[in-house]
Amino acid sequence: MRTALTVAGSDSGGGAGIQADLKSFAAVGVHGCSVITCVTAQNTRSVDSIFPLPVDEVTAQLRAVLSDFAIGAAKTGMLYSAEIVRAVADALEGSRFPIVVDPVMVATVGASLETRDLAAALSRQLLPRADLVTPNRYEAERLSGRRVRSLADARIAARRISSLGAGAVLVKGGHFRGELVDLLYHEGRFTEYRSYRYPKELHGSGCALGASITAFLTAGDPLRVAIERGRQRVAMGFATAYRAGHGVEIVNSHAIVDRHGIVRAVEDGAAVAARIIPLAWTPEVGVNLGYALPGATSLADVCALEGRIIRVGERLQATGPARFGASRHVARIILTAMRYDPRLRSAINLKYREKNRTRLKKMGFALGTFAREREPRGASTMEWGTEQAIRRLGRVPDVIADRGGVGKEAMMRILGEEPADVLRKVRRIVRGA
């Protein structure tokens, strides 16, 4: 079985560290080996004590694991001291598997998880061996030696950290203000990953991200694919976070979504939609119903009909099975909406008639609109239009409509938390028309 390794501290509360890493490995489907560097007494409110294991014991654990298991990728977390960094770097010398370094320095609850010489030791001894480094804003400051207050600062810091020898740098955006943007610097170019910012602190998010990326690398994914899939898993963990103690919530690092249930919900919903949608409301391009995974970040995370709901004689019929990645139109609307409200994971498209504008508002639906003729050249209509409607209204609307354009039908998209929610809105709109 494919095997991943985590070298990190033990969290007695189970929300971060070794415990979170192993849950993340298992959720992806790889076996997890662990090397414990420190034992911490902590919970969701505080870190009460840190006991670093003797360096010889850390080395013994590394030898035991590396001498027996074919490691596919490794991740380091809380290393705490220069001595432990040196031992880990020496043990990993010459290894051929990818190494992800999460330069843990401070806990979510604010406690320091390092000695003074940690950052220098990481820079000299471990980062040159790393395929990916995943610092947050404060860790990026320590490793780069410069203040990081903006995305522009993060770009400079990422270049500096990369110059220490790291193959790639992912500066996490959780500690910046404004829109959540993770910044990747890899092979001389930057990639920005944008997603919804949850208005709360969550325990274990950094561990879950690094471990998920490591698990996907172990499974054979290229680095960029592993990062994208890892971010999606963490977004799903945020969406399903839970409270176990009396302090901060815990990221659900072992979340496993019922993909079959989502497929079934789309197919069942499509059958209902074919019965309740009048022919006059059906666009020439057909109707599609989409439903995204929690925390979805890509088209592959959205399930929709392959063949849409189309007119067959004097009735509508759902054609083709539901499949993840089957839609572009509806999927882009859902993904854009989820960046602003991750609860809204489903949408359907219907023909729009201008006379419905007043009726929709009287029925209490929030209506957002956009004008296709104002779309910038090269933009994706559905992403740009959805974002325009959201920004103009100040929140995600129930219905997003446009009047069409040359060769384009006037269309409205009804959004909801799940297909059943969307179809409840469709019923109300149709009956009130």
Where are the regions that the model predicts?
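Charged C-terminal helix
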Residues: 52, 225-281, 286-292
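Short, small-residue alpha-helix embedded
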Residues: 19-24, 141-142, 200-223
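Phosphate-handling active-site elements
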Residues: 28-33, 191, 216-230
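Conserved N-terminal subdomain of the carbohydrate kinase-like
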Residues: 1-6, 18-109, 253-257
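C-terminal binding/interaction regions
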Residues: 354-433
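Short pre-catalytic strand/loop immediately N-terminal to key active-site residues, enriched for Gly-Thr
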Residues: 7-13, 190-203
